[in-house]
Amino acid sequence: MAKKSMIAKNKRPAKFSTQAYTRCEKCGRPHSVYRKFQLCRVCFRDLAYKGQVPGVTKASW
């Protein structure tokens, strides 16, 4: 989990567009965030297995 101060800082608009970065909406993790879902890989995997991410199914071949 990210610090509450870092999550609050990320919610404020950045002064310049280059300062903006993605964070996971669920846990606040700054690395490995899927932009389409706004979730990190850990949270994405957890929610996908539970079936809570619409349009995502387990791959089988």
Swiss-Prot record:
State the free-text cofactor note: Binds 1 zinc ion per subunit.
Cofactor(s) named in the record: Zn(2+)
Q: Where does Zn(2+) bind?
A: C24, C27, C40, C43
Return one Gene Ontology term, BP aspect. Answer: translation
From the UniProt record, which GO molecular function terms apply?
rRNA binding; structural constituent of ribosome; zinc ion binding
Family of this protein: Belongs to the universal ribosomal protein uS14 family. Zinc-binding uS14 subfamily.
Q: What does this protein do?
A: Binds 16S rRNA, required for the assembly of 30S particles and may also be responsible for determining the conformation of the 16S rRNA at the A site.
Q: How does it assemble?
A: Part of the 30S ribosomal subunit. Contacts proteins S3 and S10.
Query: Know the name of this protein?
Result: Small ribosomal subunit protein uS14B
Question: In which organism is this protein found?
Answer: Streptococcus agalactiae serotype V (strain ATCC BAA-611 / 2603 V/R)
